[in-house]
Amino acid sequence: MTTAAAIAVVSALAVSAHAQSIAGPYLAARSAALQSDFEQAASYFTQALARDPGNVQLMESAVVSQLAMGRIERAAPIATALVSSGQQSQIAELVLTAKSILDEDYQALAGKIPQGEGIGPLVDGLVGAWGLMGVGKVSEALAGFDKLAERPGLLGFALYHKAMALASVGDYEGAEQIFASDGTGSVVQTRRGVLARVEILSQLNRDGEALELLQRMFSGATDPEIDLIVAALNDDEPLPFKHVASVQDGFAEVFYSVAAALRSEAGPEYTILYAQVARALRPGHVDALLLTAELFETLGQHDEAIVVYKGVPSDHPAYHAAELGRSAAMRRSGKPEAAIEVLEQLARTHGQLASVQSALGDALRQEDRFADAVVAYDRAVALAEDSGGPSWFLLYARAISNERQGNWEAAEAGFRAALEVNPGQPQVLNYLGYSLVEKTEKLDEALGLIEQAVAASPDSGYIIDSLGWALYRLGRYDEAVPHMERAVELMAVDPVVNDHLGDVYWAVGRKREAEFQWARALSFVDEDDPLSEAKPDRIRRKLEIGLDAVLEEEGAAPLEVAQD
């Protein structure tokens, strides 16, 4: 072998070993990123980058993963290297901007016109204006907001932040003039925008207008934060302006308002980057915290959401909202008992809130603790009576719990009460109609209720199954067949629907097809669920001796075709 050939072999082996050394962490990182597991993705991308430091794709991915976890300090060195390599990266610019703000290097941001693509016109414009505020150039900053307002689609954001900038330096009159103008758009109609304006009006001793604004915007709806604000206004206590009390708060508000807007426009994996910057710049920004937790939930990262929700202090007015979110995330992550414990503790501290009692009822109902659920629902209904009355769903959920524990009289009354609140609600119409069919009560009314439900929700397998089953119970077997077949098309692996179709087939003489459907139902049934409507022992008995014989054994009425 020549020297050149030997060098080529050694070089090939080195390249192969290098490729193998990076492949493991890279593939693991890609897999984690696809599942939105940013914690693992950040770890593996960092490992891969350590083995291939100049790889700009790895740099970008590592920056994204670290930022998604809110780790600006870890993302910043990688972002610096990425930009230094000549690579244009919006996310790297986002990280470096956040790092400058954290370092209070406002001069670097004042009126900044980004080289390359920057972060984007909206963020770059707002950051530049707030940077000017940070170095004391208030007039130039206000002009910067005005210039940004001239760009299509950015007027509302620019004016909102101009109002916040004015209020942050005590010019509440100027801030209110902006809010009172017609051009501010939807940005100031958000809950956060409304509450900021309420604080400004209070600083101007215009408490009556502040109260009227709350009533107009929230239509009397209340929560602990609004209750505290209303009480202070009624007592003539001036509300401090807390929404943007400093330049740092202003920067945080930039990224929060962009994240809130992106929520309905972009994917959660992108939106969370802006929400995390807002949190990093202002750790006490509870709205940003709640948004971040909700985005983690949307991404299926329930454990991360649980951690973030836990960050809301127990004395904050939004604590109950955070605990409701934390319990929901626990339930979705397979920890139902822990979720119930959180809600039970919350009911001890915030039991005066109908939403807390209702959530506790829901969690208990989902664990088949129907008697306990009814107790919680009763409290929720009583509390709701004092604030406009209970929702149809609250009455419906309580009725289900009563029905499942055998209290049919209360259940029927509850379903009918829910229909008074929402007369055409298909879920309620279906549940009431189906329950009447199962009890062989008021069958004509039951059929009418279910037909209304089908008209309102024609693609619901459960509701179409109810219609077919009602027709079967009425002895209208031939009419039941197409509806039951359609229900099975929509819910192919549901044991109850397959069992029902088997019974209908048997009733019209299609016995072999009936046995096939019963066998399918048996393959899908959960043997460990005693509350399941599909009873495996009964299905097996039908397969052994047929439906007619089973009905005879049970002392039930035989199959009989309805007479016209």
Predicted feature locations:
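Residue-level recognition of tetratricopeptide repeat
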Residues: 21, 30, 55, 64, 89-90, 98, 121, 130, ...
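TPR alpha-solenoid repeat register
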Residues: 58, 92, 124, 158, ...
